[in-house]
Amino acid sequence: MSGKIKVTFIINDGEEKTVEAPIGLSILEIAHSNDLDLEGACEGSLACATCHVILEEEFYNKLKKPTEAEEDMLDLAFGLTDTSRLGCQIILTEELDGIKVRIPATTRNIKL
Protein backbone atom coordinates (compact mmCIF):
# COMPACT_ATOMS: atom_id res chain seq x y z
CA MET A 1 0.00 0.00 0.00
CA SER A 2 1.22 3.48 -0.83
CA GLY A 3 0.41 4.99 2.55
CA LYS A 4 -2.94 6.34 1.41
CA ILE A 5 -6.50 5.12 1.81
CA LYS A 6 -9.85 6.11 0.33
CA VAL A 7 -12.13 8.19 2.54
CA THR A 8 -15.65 9.12 1.45
CA PHE A 9 -17.27 12.14 3.05
CA ILE A 10 -21.06 12.33 2.90
CA ILE A 11 -22.20 15.94 3.03
CA ASN A 12 -25.55 16.85 4.61
CA ASP A 13 -27.40 16.83 1.27
CA GLY A 14 -26.23 13.27 0.56
CA GLU A 15 -23.48 14.31 -1.85
CA GLU A 16 -20.42 12.08 -1.60
CA LYS A 17 -16.83 13.17 -2.06
CA THR A 18 -14.15 10.48 -2.12
CA VAL A 19 -10.55 11.49 -1.50
CA GLU A 20 -7.22 9.73 -1.13
CA ALA A 21 -5.90 10.44 2.33
CA PRO A 22 -2.50 9.79 3.92
CA ILE A 23 -2.43 7.25 6.73
CA GLY A 24 -1.66 8.87 10.09
CA LEU A 25 -3.73 12.03 9.63
CA SER A 26 -7.07 12.67 11.31
CA ILE A 27 -10.47 12.88 9.64
CA LEU A 28 -10.53 16.56 10.65
CA GLU A 29 -7.19 17.22 8.90
CA ILE A 30 -8.35 15.39 5.76
CA ALA A 31 -11.63 17.33 5.69
CA HIS A 32 -9.79 20.65 5.99
CA SER A 33 -7.20 19.78 3.35
CA ASN A 34 -10.05 18.96 0.93
CA ASP A 35 -12.09 22.10 1.66
CA LEU A 36 -14.92 20.19 3.33
CA ASP A 37 -17.11 21.98 5.84
CA LEU A 38 -16.09 20.29 9.09
CA GLU A 39 -15.49 23.06 11.57
CA GLY A 40 -13.01 21.93 14.24
CA ALA A 41 -13.19 25.18 16.24
CA CYS A 42 -10.69 23.99 18.86
CA GLU A 43 -8.24 22.75 16.17
CA GLY A 44 -8.26 19.19 17.45
CA SER A 45 -7.57 19.90 21.12
CA LEU A 46 -10.68 18.05 22.39
CA ALA A 47 -12.29 21.25 23.65
CA CYS A 48 -15.40 21.33 21.44
CA ALA A 49 -17.67 19.03 19.44
CA THR A 50 -17.71 20.89 16.13
CA CYS A 51 -15.87 18.12 14.25
CA HIS A 52 -18.59 15.61 15.15
CA VAL A 53 -18.99 12.99 12.42
CA ILE A 54 -21.14 9.89 12.02
CA LEU A 55 -19.59 6.62 10.88
CA GLU A 56 -20.98 3.40 9.47
CA GLU A 57 -21.08 0.75 12.19
CA GLU A 58 -18.54 -1.45 10.37
CA PHE A 59 -15.89 1.27 10.61
CA TYR A 60 -16.97 2.56 14.01
CA ASN A 61 -16.26 -0.92 15.40
CA LYS A 62 -12.71 -0.90 13.96
CA LEU A 63 -11.74 2.13 16.07
CA LYS A 64 -10.48 2.14 19.63
CA LYS A 65 -13.19 3.13 22.08
CA PRO A 66 -13.53 6.89 22.63
CA THR A 67 -11.63 8.29 25.59
CA GLU A 68 -13.58 9.75 28.49
CA ALA A 69 -12.63 13.26 27.29
CA GLU A 70 -13.99 12.52 23.81
CA GLU A 71 -17.19 11.06 25.27
CA ASP A 72 -17.64 14.21 27.38
CA MET A 73 -17.38 16.37 24.26
CA LEU A 74 -19.63 14.04 22.24
CA ASP A 75 -22.32 14.50 24.90
CA LEU A 76 -22.48 18.12 23.73
CA ALA A 77 -22.70 17.31 20.01
CA PHE A 78 -25.87 18.10 18.11
CA GLY A 79 -27.53 15.03 16.55
CA LEU A 80 -25.48 12.45 18.46
CA THR A 81 -25.83 8.84 17.23
CA ASP A 82 -24.55 5.45 18.40
CA THR A 83 -21.73 5.70 15.84
CA SER A 84 -20.75 9.34 16.44
CA ARG A 85 -17.11 10.28 16.92
CA LEU A 86 -15.03 13.44 16.81
CA GLY A 87 -13.15 13.78 13.53
CA CYS A 88 -10.04 15.03 15.34
CA GLN A 89 -9.82 11.73 17.24
CA ILE A 90 -10.06 9.38 14.25
CA ILE A 91 -6.54 8.72 12.97
CA LEU A 92 -6.45 6.97 9.61
CA THR A 93 -5.00 3.47 9.39
CA GLU A 94 -4.88 0.91 6.55
CA GLU A 95 -7.77 -0.88 8.27
CA LEU A 96 -10.01 2.16 7.64
CA ASP A 97 -9.59 2.05 3.83
CA GLY A 98 -13.00 2.78 2.30
CA ILE A 99 -14.41 4.50 5.40
CA LYS A 100 -17.53 6.61 4.91
CA VAL A 101 -17.82 9.68 7.11
CA ARG A 102 -21.10 11.60 7.33
CA ILE A 103 -20.75 15.27 8.17
CA PRO A 104 -23.93 16.30 10.04
CA ALA A 105 -25.88 19.30 8.77
CA THR A 106 -25.28 21.24 11.97
CA THR A 107 -22.67 21.39 14.68
CA ARG A 108 -22.67 23.26 17.92
CA ASN A 109 -19.71 25.18 19.30
CA ILE A 110 -20.16 25.15 23.09
CA LYS A 111 -17.98 28.24 23.47
CA LEU A 112 -20.58 30.47 21.78
Curated annotation (Swiss-Prot):
Q: How is the cofactor bound?
A: Binds 1 [2Fe-2S] cluster.
GO process annotations (BP):
P450-containing electron transport chain
Which cofactors, by name? [2Fe-2S] cluster
Xref: PROSITE patterns: 2FE2S_FER_2, ADX
Residues at which [2Fe-2S] cluster binds: 42, 48, 51, 88
Please give one Pfam family short name: Fer2
Q: Which SUPFAM superfamilies match?
A: 2Fe-2S ferredoxin-like
Kindly give the CDD domains that the UniProt entry links to this protein: fer2 (cd00207)
Per UniProt, residues of the 2Fe-2S ferredoxin-type domain are 5-107
InterPro entries reported in the protein's UniProt record: 2Fe-2S_ferredoxin-like_sf (IPR036010), 2Fe-2S_ferredoxin-type (IPR001041), Adrenodoxin-like (IPR001055), Adrenodoxin_Fe-S_BS (IPR018298), Beta-grasp_dom_sf (IPR012675)
State a single Gene Ontology molecular function: metal ion binding
Which keywords does the record carry?
2Fe-2S, Electron transport, Iron, Iron-sulfur, Metal-binding, Transport
What the protein does comes down to: Ferredoxin are iron-sulfur proteins that transfer electrons in a wide variety of metabolic reactions.
Please give the family membership noted in the entry.
Answer: Belongs to the adrenodoxin/putidaredoxin family.
Protein name according to UniProt: 2Fe-2S ferredoxin
**Annotated source species:** Rickettsia conorii (strain ATCC VR-613 / Malish 7)
